[in-house]
From Swiss-Prot:
<feature type="site" description="Positions MEP for the nucleophilic attack">
    <location>
        <position position="155"/>
    </location>
</feature>
<dbReference type="GO" id="GO:0050518">
    <property type="term" value="F:2-C-methyl-D-erythritol 4-phosphate cytidylyltransferase activity"/>
</dbReference>
<dbReference type="InterPro" id="IPR050088">
    <property type="entry name" value="IspD/TarI_cytidylyltransf_bact"/>
</dbReference>
<keyword id="KW-0548">Nucleotidyltransferase</keyword>
<keyword id="KW-0414">Isoprene biosynthesis</keyword>
<dbReference type="Pfam" id="PF01128">
    <property type="entry name" value="IspD"/>
</dbReference>
<dbReference type="InterPro" id="IPR029044">
    <property type="entry name" value="Nucleotide-diphossugar_trans"/>
</dbReference>
<keyword id="KW-0808">Transferase</keyword>
<comment type="function">
    <text>Catalyzes the formation of 4-diphosphocytidyl-2-C-methyl-D-erythritol from CTP and 2-C-methyl-D-erythritol 4-phosphate (MEP).</text>
</comment>
<feature type="site" description="Transition state stabilizer">
    <location>
        <position position="23"/>
    </location>
</feature>
<protein>
    <recommendedName>
        <fullName>2-C-methyl-D-erythritol 4-phosphate cytidylyltransferase</fullName>
        <ecNumber>2.7.7.60</ecNumber>
    </recommendedName>
</protein>
<feature type="site" description="Positions MEP for the nucleophilic attack">
    <location>
        <position position="209"/>
    </location>
</feature>
<dbReference type="InterPro" id="IPR001228">
    <property type="entry name" value="IspD"/>
</dbReference>
<feature type="site" description="Transition state stabilizer">
    <location>
        <position position="16"/>
    </location>
</feature>
<comment type="similarity">
    <text>Belongs to the IspD/TarI cytidylyltransferase family. IspD subfamily.</text>
</comment>
<dbReference type="GO" id="GO:0019288">
    <property type="term" value="P:isopentenyl diphosphate biosynthetic process, methylerythritol 4-phosphate pathway"/>
</dbReference>
<comment type="pathway">
    <text>Isoprenoid biosynthesis; isopentenyl diphosphate biosynthesis via DXP pathway; isopentenyl diphosphate from 1-deoxy-D-xylulose 5-phosphate: step 2/6.</text>
</comment>
């Protein structure tokens, strides 16, 4: 019987934060941002394993306390790109080809439990797999040089990709073993290069990615509301 496992690529530096450390280790409500991400995943009982892929020379991880759970595994096999980190993590995970792998951004620390449940419920019998995503709600503008509007782009049929992105381990390994160009920015786009069509599963606006300093403020507010409601 196939299992579900989560894989969190956490080998990046997060340079856009302008911080003194990789953003996954920034303090968020008294714990590293990554710790909140892992707690969200470990709260899902259907995840048999939660794998974190770190850079081989990571000097930050061991400085912090992490959730104590036998399902949590640390792999220091991260690569220069996200795709390399995910591929290396798959190679070292020893997962069966038909196991489901849920790749989740380290910086999406507010993943709502019902969104994760919805993803697994929707895709566990799907022939391809898919990802959490949200329909684009805002008007889109394409720019020219000098930040002038070149045109208004129709948002019809456009979605914002989120994570987790859920695919069979064998299929994902095959997709990531192929030469990839800059157009492949997530697992779903690699799967698309195989001629397959991932399914879009409605995500959640709270499942945002911490990218800029102001995102930390929003994440603190979301986590504070969650804690207040417990």
């Amino acid at each position: 019987m196939s299992r579900c496992l989560a894989l969190v690529p956490a080998a990046g530096g997060g340079s856009r934060m302008g911080a003194d450390r990789p953003k996954q280790y920034l303090d968020l409500a008294g714990a590293p941002l990554l710790a909140h991400t892992l707690r969200r995943l470990l709260a899902e009982p259907r995840l048999a394993r939660v794998l974190v892929v770190l850079a081989p020379d990571d000097v930050w991880f061991d400085r912090f306390d992490w959730p104590r759970d036998v399902r949590l595994e640390i792999l220091r096999v991260g690569g220069a790109t996200r795709a390399e980190s995910v591929r290396n993590g798959l190679l070292h995970a020893g997962a069966a080809a038909d196991d489901w792998v849920l790749v989740h951004d380290a910086a999406r620390c507010c993943l709502p439990p019902d969104a994760l449940d919805r993803l697994i419920d929707t895709l566990q019998a799907d022939p391809v797999g898919g990802l959490l995503a949200l329909p684009v709600a805002d008007t889109l503008k394409r720019e020219t040089s000098g930040q002038r509007v070149a045109q208004t782009v129709s948002r019809e049929g456009l979605w914002l990709a989120q994570t987790p992105q859920m695919f069979r381990a064998g299929m994902l390994a095959l997709a990531l073993d192929r030469p990839l160009d800059r157009a492949v920015t997530d697992e779903a786009s690699a799967i698309e290069r195989l001629g397959l069509v991932p399914r879009l599963v409605t995500g959640d606006a709270l499942n945002f990615k911490v990218t800029w300093p102001h995102d930390l403020v929003l994440a603190r507010a979301v986590l504070g509301l969650d804690n207040a409601g417990k």
